[in-house]
Amino acid sequence: DIKYSRIWQIAYPIILGSIAQNLINITDTAFLGRVGEIALGAGALGGLFYLAVIMLGLGFSTGAQIIIARRNGEGKPKEIGQIIDQSLYFILPMAILTFLLLRYWSVFILDFAVKSENIFIETSIYLKYRSYGIFFAMGNMVFRAFYVGLAKTKVITYTTLVLAIVNISLDYILIFGKFGAPEMG
């Protein structure tokens, strides 16, 4: 017997995590907007490009999440471990390929899509730095699938809140060059 309260217990941590993720996006926009139009445009364009690439991992992890939830419902925890192992084995080559795409091949796509030379240069630089995060992002997707599949979504809220705090702090430090860090704009 499923009740709305049980669904809410599972859903609200995911909702809070999504709010924290959007807070990161708003903060990125606010900080880059203070730097200038080119930085803001490069961040927005690079962010969309990154999002399009990361969707590959999200699609895969959603499939893993469904299978994990099924095995959890069937009471087969050992099989859940095998699913996680296989997911990590699959996601690593995917992360390597998407890293290469972001780091080295994105300039060819951007050259075709971006008219402004300044935005092209800044977006290329942004994606080169951002490309290193793909490994963490895709690994995180597997573990997110694990916790959602087990209906233990509060873990996602805590990790996303930590992510938001770290991201906003590093944005401030690195964009504006605070505490001795280089100003990266």
Would you name each region that the model predicts?
Residues D1-A11, I68-F135, V166, F179-M184:
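Short alpha-helical transmembrane segments in multi-pass integral membrane proteins
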Residues Y4-L23, T27, F49-L56, Y132, ...:
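Residue-level signal for short hydrophobic patches within transmembrane helices
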Residues A11, L23-I26, R34-E37, R71-E74, ...:
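Helix-loop interface residues and adjacent transmembrane-helix termini in multi-pass membrane transporters
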Residues A11, S18, A44-G47, I91, ...:
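Residue-level recognition of transmembrane alpha-helices
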Residues L16, D28-L32, G43, I68-G73, ...:
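Hydrophobic/aromatic residues within transmembrane alpha-helices of membrane transport systems
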Residues L32-L51, E117-E122:
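Interfacial/gating helices of multi-pass transporter permease domains
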Residues L40-L100, A137-I156:
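Small-residue-rich hydrophobic transmembrane alpha-helices
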Residues K115-S116, F120-T123, L127, I134-L161:
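Cytoplasmic helix-loop-helix junction between adjacent transmembrane helices
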